[in-house]
């Protein structure tokens, strides 16, 4: 089936981001043409951009990812400021993963899960099967040795997974996805950080009202004061924003 969905791209600090107007458009785009796309999905936010500017390996990994999207509200506001009239909305990574799993369950798309604690991963699998009848063809928790990487990649290839989601945190998940794609390129890869913990209720996400106001970062800071140092780093991004350096 021929692809029909057209989505604009926007440049921020040297990175090209897809600008989705809402989650529905994002999902239609990823499944456009009758099957899920192949490539790598990466959530972009201010912290990741700042880190990439100091980490050449991460920068290269992000450059290689085909589907970078505006996960943070800072990305959306920066796009709208640089490109007035841009019809773009935030696509939160946790919400995108759930939407992707729901669509995969409906269409029978084979899914492989990587990362998380063994108990959390088991809960995630159980909930995905019971809630959306997701066709899970394999899984691996995040506690494996370097010498187990190649056998894992072969397992993924043999499983025929069309979607592989990796919950290991950045940049570990991006590195693993890059390496796995060399063995099994016929899949959509998505780095999901701590999403399994949120999905299973082990980590509480900000209430919807905070999310809708673009204040999820503040909720996390108030819940975890140890994040203060990380948040202060974002002042550099704020300076980019107000000086028109996006």
Swiss-Prot record:
GO biological process per UniProt: enterobacterial common antigen biosynthetic process
Keyword Glycosyltransferase: yes
Matches recorded under Pfam families: Glyco_tran_WecG
Protein's pathway: Bacterial outer membrane biogenesis; enterobacterial common antigen biosynthesis
Reaction equation(s) it catalyzes: UDP-N-acetyl-alpha-D-mannosaminouronate + N-acetyl-alpha-D-glucosaminyl-di-trans,octa-cis-undecaprenyl diphosphate = beta-D-ManNAcA-(1->4)-alpha-D-GlcNAc-di-trans,octa-cis-undecaprenyl diphosphate + UDP + H(+)
GO MF terms held by the record: lipopolysaccharide N-acetylmannosaminouronosyltransferase activity
Enzyme Commission numbers on file: 2.4.1.180
Keywords, ordered alphabetically: Glycosyltransferase, Transferase
Keyword Transferase: yes
PANTHER family to which the protein is assigned, alphabetical: PTHR34136, UDP-N-ACETYL-D-MANNOSAMINURONIC ACID TRANSFERASE (PTHR34136:SF1)
Known role: Catalyzes the synthesis of Und-PP-GlcNAc-ManNAcA (Lipid II), the second lipid-linked intermediate involved in enterobacterial common antigen (ECA) synthesis.
Sequence similarity: Belongs to the glycosyltransferase 26 family.
Protein name: UDP-N-acetyl-D-mannosaminuronic acid transferase
Species of provenance: Serratia proteamaculans (strain 568)
Gene symbol of the encoding locus: wecG
